[in-house]
Amino acid sequence: MTHWEFKGRELVNCTCEYGCNCQFNALPDKGHCHPVAGIHIDEGHHGDTRLDGLKIAAIFKWPGAIHEGNGEAIAFVDERADDAQREALLKIMTGQDTDPFATMFAVYASTVTNMHAPVFTDIDFEVDVEGRRGRLSIADYVEMTGEPIRNKVSGEESRAQIVLPAGFEYAVADIGSASSRSTGPVEVEFRDSYGQFANLHLNSHGVVRS
């Protein structure tokens, strides 16, 4: 198994309300799970292949809860990646070179039965985790925006976090509001729903905890 590790930042938007039951081992509140995710790798490697500064994204659709399977997915890889980097990123994203179920990549890959061909393209993605703002734009495929949750009375920004001491994706996530719309082989659309902003530190064995 080739060892990999990276630090980065993510924005994830799904169909759930702001709390996202899935983070607490409960069933999705809409009965299905349709997420869009973008990740900026600040620094990382897969074996001797550097991954610094590259971006990846994905769209998923599960007809029920994630663990029930039968998912559909499409992966997007930064067109700036060379052949070695593309191969490395796809291995990470599909749960290869990873302990069983140690990362969200490995968990999700095990529940997807219809994986579309990956797309190598320009990924316009930026995210401010602490500020709870971000956007993802992939031409002809997907648009996602994220912002802070607003207090329903005062209109002021509201901040909440989810802490998962034994999670497989992040240690702490800031929660905001996000909206997504996609076209192409995996179509989703939802507004003002669960937005997950997180700093990531992952490797072949799972979340790296200090």
Language model features: what each stretch is:
Residues 19-21, 42-44, 61, 80, ...:
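Generic structural motif
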Residues 2-46:
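N-terminal ordered "arm"
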Residues 144, 149-210:
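Extended, charged low-complexity segments
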Residues 71, 75-156, 160:
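Charged linear interaction tracts used for macromolecular binding and regulation
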Residues 48-55, 75, 109-115, 163, ...:
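Low-complexity, flexible helical/coil segments
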Residues 31-102:
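Aromatic- and glycine-enriched beta-alpha-beta binding-site module
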Residues 23-32, 64-69, 119-137, 178-182:
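Short, surface-exposed loop and linker segments with low hydrophobicity and enrichment for Pro/Ser/Thr
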Residues 26, 47-49, 85, 146-148, ...:
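Short acidic, gly/pro-rich beta-turn/loop elements at beta-sheet edges
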